[in-house]
Amino acid sequence: MSKTVLSKIGALLLPLIFSVFCAFPSFAQTENTVTIQAKDIALEKVMQQIEKQTRCVFLNKDVDVKENVSVNISGKTLSETLNILFKGKDIDWKIDSGHIIISKKVAQSKATEGKATTSQISGVVIDEEGVPVIGVGVLIQGTTIGTGTDLDGNFSFVLPEGMENSSLEFSCLGYTTQVLKIGNRRVFNVTMTSDAILMEGTVVTALGIKRSEKALSYNVQQVNADEVTMNKDANFINSLNGKVAGLNINASSSGVGGASKVVMRGMKSISQSSNALYVIDGVPMYTTARDGGTQFASQGSTDPIADINPEDIESISVLTGAAAAALYGSDAANGAIVVTTKKGKEGKLSATASASVEFMTPFVLPRFQNRYGTGDLNSSIGSDVRSWGNLMNDANNPKYSPAKDYFQTGVTHNESVSVSMGNEKNQSYLSGSSIDSYGIVPNNRYNRYNFTFRNTTSFLKDKMHLDFSASFISQKDKNMTNQGTYNNPLVGAYIFPRSNDWEAVRMYERYDVVRRLSTQYWPIGDAGMTMQNPYWINYRNLRENRKDRFMLNAQMSYDILDWLNISGRVKMDQSTTKYTEKFYASTFTQLTESSQNGLYGISQMTDRQIYADFLVNINKRFGQDWNLQVNLGTSISDMFYDALKNRGPIADGQMSAERAGIANVFNVQNLSNSTKTTRLQDGWREQTQSIFGSAELGFKGAYYLTLTARNDWPSQLAGPHSNRKSFFYPSIGGSVVLSQIIPNMPKALEYFWNT
């Protein structure tokens, strides 16, 4: 990447980074000193101020924190602050691993000391794996008398007289509440069991809506970020191979960073695409497939989703089937892959860095015979490229093998660094990564550089939330391998006659004294399939692609009530691509539009997507049994594409009244004026306006009914002769969780009806 581009990126990001750092308080100061001036306020409020300034958390073991206190503390350490705050009060405190544990002082006289063993309730609480559980509430049932477990799961408190016939209640979020009779028992060692219902996870579904996993009437499979980054691929989609049931990923032959085809549960159409829709943080990423060209001008290509940095991914949800992605309309008829990216986290500044090196060699190759030499004993036609001639012996057998003689060891360097920082109001995330790859065929390169900044903040008493992110991707690839026979070096590497000398064709060009330039050396000809010297294709049929991509995303939400909120988001995704072709003189003329002087092509393309939506979200319980989740919204998607293309043969004087151009000089002024030269400005714009809604009704956490509907008004149907102006996409689904109805239900049979 050039210094100019880097300087522009620095000029863009430095003010943002500086403003974010200025927004944060100094962590070092808040850890060492505390300053509080308060008069006649609740002790609980003072404790909250201490938590904010020290990043410690209070654990309260039966202390009344509602009483009012007055304090005037300035620049004191945490220990000094606690001594001042609790001076003269019946409160003990201690600091342990970032926790401040407070409890009542227990004063026992000698007269009652002997009875303490009979009135002291104590014990330890662990989970099913034997790990101490912190924060378990231990209360005498029906009262507020009790305490909570400390960092080691221990608890103790004084049992008041006359309550021996009561019961102890052990409760903690995510665990099943336990009730045990006290009686004569004074020591309780309790094992908490996970509550399968409370521990139910949520998944990210269409439009970024989070829903309970058990309530879904369709299949959603989640993939954690670790599974994507464990074995990194330049296109992270390839890392999903084998991790999602029913997902078939076909990586292209273009090499590192090449496009991949993702098909869920089989092909859906012969003539139309069966590829899944990609969704990044709730916003669809529409793939504007680049024209692959004609049979003589084909080009390997990458994919917009391949530009995403795997290290920026938090999680991936795979929505299989039309019902799962109905809220996206026809674009997600083949399913959707929903990607959630990372954001800053509250706490101290943290930085992570990673580096990896990957080596690549061909895994599966055709089996080649090495017994018969060049020629064909049954036919003299085309025998120069066949390998069914006379038997070879050790003396005349060069033992040519594409694996060791043509392919090289590919190397991919992947480096990334990320920084996360923030407080309870403001969090930021920054990351940068680079991929530098050398392919397994000569002169094949792929380079990509990613820069991301994201900031989330909340204000208006935490009712309003703002999420802003910006990304810049610079990508360059060179000589991505084409599929088929034209411009594909593997054709010559595989068909090369077995007894010919491969070392001779390594020198792929020879100087022609007549033409006064270097020309291709390939003694066996094109074999009727436009076959060329593989090294000539690698070094003299150059195809280079350069892309700069900007993504800006902003989202704002406001909590009107605890069960009602509204949100809106807007995203711009713009790519500028420059693609060049340089075919040198003596390339087979079938590939250069019959020119002896070569071919040149240059295309500059810009595509831009602007997406915006607005949602009203309702999530409300009615009584103990009913739950309703409703999402209503509208969206607009605007797509723009513009291209300027010049491609044609370099003038060689074959046309009348046309002067010959200069061989191997690649510019548009040197192109022939023949009809085979293309000079084209192309472009289009389309827009889709939509309304959508979903409703999910749950009963007793066991029965769920889900309805969705979407109506699209695409611009393609806006013409006066269109018989239909819009499309309507409804869906209905339901599920029954038998484990909520039948006790001890085997896990494999929990979901009875899920359609």
Can you annotate each of these PLM segments?
Residues 24-35, 57-70, 131, 137-154, ...:
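N-terminal periplasmic "start-of-domain" segments of outer-membrane beta-barrel proteins
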Residues 15-112, 142-150, 156:
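N-terminal export/assembly leaders
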Residues 47-54, 89, 95-141, 167-176, ...:
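Short, acidic, small-residue-rich periplasmic hinge/interaction motif at the N-terminus
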Residues 439-452, 471-473, 479-484, 544-549, ...:
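Small-side-chain secondary-structure face that scaffolds active or pore-lining regions
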Residues 213, 222, 229, 243-246, ...:
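Residues embedded in well-ordered regular secondary structure
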Residues 366-385, 473-524, 581, 636-662, ...:
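A surface-exposed, glycine/aromatic-enriched loop/edge motif typical of exported proteins
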Residues 392-420, 584, 590, 594-702:
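Outer-membrane beta-barrel transmembrane domain signature of Gram-negative proteins
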Residues 155-160, 283-320:
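Short acidic/polar hinge/loop motifs at secondary-structure boundaries
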